[in-house]
Amino acid sequence: MGFHIYEIKARQIIDSRGNPTVEADVILEDGTYGRAAVPSGASTGINEAVELRDGDKSVYMGKGVLKAIENIKNIIAPELEGMSALNQVAIDRKMLELDGTPTKEKLGANAILAVSMATAKAAAKYLGLRPYQYLGAYKANILPTPMCNIINGGAHSDNSVDFQEFMIMPIGAKTFSEAIRMAAEVFHTLKGILSGKGYATSVGDEGGFAPNLKSNEEACEVIIEAIKKAGYEPGKDIAIALDPATSELYDPKTKKYVLKWSTKEKLTSEQMVEYWAKWVEKYPIISIEDGMAEEDWDGWKKLTDKIGNKIQLVGDDLFVTNTSFLKKGIEMGVANSILIKVNQIGTLTETFEAVEMAKKAGYTAIVSHRSGETEDTTIADLVVALGTGQIKTGSLSRTDRIAKYNQLIRIEEELETTAEYHGKSVFYSIKQK
């Protein structure tokens, strides 16, 4: 019939940070093949699926992925060869069964995910469809409102800013292409402003600038200045989104948040909640991701009660794209959105399950890249297939980020008049003003 898996190949390639990662090819009987490469994160949740690394310090500083590749060749491939590539759920379940651990530590989530994504791409190609059409069927027509990273701090840079990502969202755009144009204009305007103030305009892992700003507040202030100077209205045309990655600032022993790159302040959960409440009043912020640490569920509840009806509160480290953690969050009334990172959970099937659970509970979902990326554009197709309406995939620089935006521009063109861009209305989990 031609749609059965004939062969699976795997290799070690290099990601955007110069670290090894896994790439897999799934080849069907008729010669059709799908290829996928796996990303990796800098700040990772403690409950994430395990990214299998070799640990041999003499090779790639211990970050080699040859064990994961051997697992694909020796364990996964023999079991999947002969199976139908058109049954994604069966493929993914077979790999989960072969691994048998909650965090995929036996085979490695990087091994499993590469095969999961490559299978879907092979199946799509076999049917003459794009991956977004194959995975999303007739519902795949919503282009995402992008979260574009323009200032980096924390673990993603080497500066005096505590918070990891300051992003802009073109909520007033009419199309995805227009959103990218608006974001690019602000990005270039910001570069000029930073340069004029004597700041460096080198970029971090995700393509945003990493200037040695004097404070966390200054990051918001220069972004607002750039939005205005580019000819847009902050909060109406373009809003700010944050990922402070506070799990990186949290000391579980003292239960304090340490602003270690700036003031050295130590804040209690209550003080951290008040900190964000003041920022939301002061700046045109529409979304905060990981505003509290992943271990601080009580703090998360307080934050949600305080500002969950004003802005989107996204759980990344908190939920790690995992339905069991998301279920707990929904039951507790914690956060109102989930970040979707395919490599946090490890298969496309589980990713779809997490998004479905979020939507049923009235939570939004944002498909996300990782700080260590490749030229693979699967998540661009995935965000359209899932219809989540939001994507987080870095800045308006670095090809590993731009590749995703360019793929979405192509998809928008292909969809023609059926393409939809929802802008601000994607925030259905918060009360609209």
Curated annotation (Swiss-Prot):
- Assign the protein's first listed, main location to one coarse class: cytoplasm
List required co-factors. Answer: Mg(2+)
| Gene3D superfamilies named among the record's database cross-references | Enolase-like C-terminal domain, Enolase-like, N-terminal domain
UniProt-listed Enzyme Commission number(s): 4.2.1.11
Where Mg(2+) binds, per the record, is at: D243, E289, D316
Q: What top-level branch of life does the organism fall under?
A: Bacteria
Under the heading HAMAP family, the entry gives:
Enolase (MF_00318)
Q: What does this protein do?
A: Catalyzes the reversible conversion of 2-phosphoglycerate (2-PG) into phosphoenolpyruvate (PEP). It is essential for the degradation of carbohydrates via glycolysis.
UniProt name for this protein: Enolase
What is the source species?
Borreliella burgdorferi (strain ATCC 35210 / DSM 4680 / CIP 102532 / B31)
